[in-house]
Amino acid sequence: SLDIALKEIKILKNLGIQGIALFPCINKKYKDNIGSESFNPNGLMQKAIKKIKENHNDDILVIADLCNCSYTSHGHCGTIIDGDVDNDLTIETLCKQSIILAESGVDIIAPSDMMDGRTGEIRKELDKNGFHKIPIFPYSVKYASSFYGPFRGAVSNSLNGGDRETHQMSFKNSSEYLREIEQDINAVSNTHLRAHETD
């Protein structure tokens, strides 16, 4: 609950921790094919950010994960068309989600979806809506491997068919990660994250 989260944040602050990262875990009844709950102004993440900022103001830095997998009924990171994730339609949803997060008061947005070109499009959308100062920390390198299982379990995310190999990286490709990081640098991101995913 939000009340428990606020108590936990107070404990973290007393330990000298100055920032937190939020990841959504929502009820199945709010999930659909495109993850529309992600850009609901009254959604869980948005309420959490507002409440944290109301209670802690600028004493705690809030990073929000930006992805659709916790919001989609199928568990994939984007909109499914003809059995596969549609990159461009997914980016549209991510852009909507980024604006709602910004309007809620988030300090940093961290896209973890691995859609091609999403960092630049999110940056354009934020700038267009007056959120020039909100940094983007993309997961530039995210592998389709088995190391991310505990996280997916923690946020109750499971795939309903298929895998993520079409948009996440193969650990067998030792040079692709450099191209991905370069692409995000060119798209004016502010730092880069690397993570391992599971199928």
Task: Please name every model-derived segment.
Residues S1-D3, G78-E92, N160-L178:
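Active-site mouth loops of central-metabolism enzymes
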Residues G16-Q18, N57-I60, V106-D107, H132-I134, ...:
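Short, well-ordered coil/turn segments that N-cap beta-strands
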Residues G35-A64, T119-S140:
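Alpha-helix-loop-beta-strand connector modules within alpha/beta enzyme cores
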